[in-house]
Amino acid sequence: MAVASRLAVARVAPDGGAAGRRRRRGRPVVAVPTAGRGRGGAVAASPPTEEAVQMTEPLTKEDLVAYLVSGCKPKENWRIGTEHEKFGFEVDTLRPIKYDQIRDILNGLAERFDWDKIVEENNVIGLKQGKQSISLEPGGQFELSGAPLETLHQTCAEVNSHLYQVKAVGEEMGIGFLGIGFQPKWALSDIPIMPKGRYEIMRNYMPKVGSLGLDMMFRTCTVQVNLDFSSEQDMIRKFHTGLALQPIATAIFANSPFKEGKPNGYLSLRSHIWTDTDNNRSGMLPFVFDDSFGFERYVDYALDVPMYFVYRNKKYIDCTGMSFRDFMVGKLPQAPGELPTLNDWENHLTTIFPEVRLKRYLEMRGADGGPWRRLCALPAFWVGLLYDEESLQSISDMTSDWTNEEREMLRRKVPVTGLKTPFRDGYVRDLAEEILQLSKNGLERRGYKEVGFLREVDAVISSGVTPAERLLNLYETKWQRSVDPVFQELLY
């Protein structure tokens, strides 16, 4: 979804793989097993422990670069990490579920399916099981951050298992979950706020830097995939490809046409919202296409992105408007003399929200949330393009002469017109057909019989009708201009 604040293990994981590394909506979280699995065992307090922020030697810029470089790994160690978010609602009233209902679901999952609880100030705010976790977005959007897996079959099985578990617990409570990119019915004032102190900092800051940041926090859902790279050059090619093609993915997966009970004028309102959330930390990052781009250039960019907060002495310190560069030299007025740890750097990287994000892997962030088949299709689309050398080279060749102006045009227009967006002498649909074939070819060459996961994408492109346009058609015909039936149509 949006404010990326996923529950993350705040220490640097030794494998550095593309795990379902959480896009965090600005929240540093440590999950340190302290009790038995499931059955109400708590994983630990979610804020970073004091031990986690003890200083050894001051960080240098080289340390920050080395952190990103540590993500490089040989192809045989590449993994697929998939994340998705969904809206919980009361089946009888369609209203968004409140925190106490979410807490009961989390407790039910822990009790029945052997998850560890993640607790913050006596509130259960997430679950962890092995390398996968469940976390809450600011408005209670329910997120699965998947484990790093080898094949799309494993990824889809993980998604299906999660949806089965959530449905089993939720149905008994009269709660359903909706797979869509933007809350279709309820106003911002109707959305509950999760009991997480750090969100207050973001809620206060967002209106200062854009008009749609609160919508992003509370009313959007996404599906994304996190993928690995082998070297700086491999990272650069994948970053280029991901940014160039992100609007194409946005078109294919466009699924947020409603707002407060009626059409909103967009096929992907979720995507549009990111254009007026906080332009200091979002967008298409044109500097990535400069000849000088590499890990160090991304570090320079991130150093100047305004911070949200620092966690010290069991408190979140509001550092909005200050840069990590200030932090590096102990010049945060709100925390005088404090110097950052790698923990702080990792958490800062998760508060940057471009269409493709670099951490120790690359995150493809352009797709709306959707029903379960599309949760499997999104990672399949990108794996076929980025994990196959031949397809990656073909895409690099295809997009190498696209200008920054053309990429920005696609970013701006696709949320409105989807596959029908003009591009050069054709339309985005024409591009999508060619790109889909390259993705299929890439999956074929992987040899895991994964091409079937692209059926949903194939159906959208061959018909030329995005998921959002299909919903709009139902709204005008069968649903008799009511959005209420979407809660059943896109129910998990």
Swiss-Prot record:
Disulfide bonds join C156-C376. It is an enzyme of class 6 (ligase). GO terms for biological process: glutathione biosynthetic process. The Cys-156-Cys-376 disulfide bridge is known to modulate the enzyme activity according to the redox status. The oxidized form constitutes the active enzyme. Pfam families: GCS2. One of its GO terms (cellular component) is chloroplast. It is found in: Plastid, Chloroplast. The keyword Nucleotidyltransferase does not apply. The keyword Nucleotide-binding applies. Pathway: Sulfur metabolism; glutathione biosynthesis; glutathione from L-cysteine and L-glutamate: step 1/2. GO terms for molecular function: ATP binding; glutamate-cysteine ligase activity. Gene3D superfamilies: 3.30.590.20. InterPro entries: GCL_bact_plant (IPR035434), GCS2 (IPR006336), Gln_synth/guanido_kin_cat_dom (IPR014746), Glut_cys_lig_pln_type (IPR011556). Keywords: ATP-binding, Chloroplast, Disulfide bond, Glutathione biosynthesis, Ligase, Nucleotide-binding, Plastid, Transit peptide. It catalyses: L-cysteine + L-glutamate + ATP = gamma-L-glutamyl-L-cysteine + ADP + phosphate + H(+). Its EC number is 6.3.2.2. Belongs to the carboxylate-amine ligase family. Glutamate--cysteine ligase type 2 subfamily. PANTHER family: GLUTAMATE--CYSTEINE LIGASE, CHLOROPLASTIC. Homodimer or monomer when oxidized or reduced, respectively. This is Glutamate--cysteine ligase A, chloroplastic. It comes from Oryza sativa subsp. indica (Rice). The gene is GSH1-1.
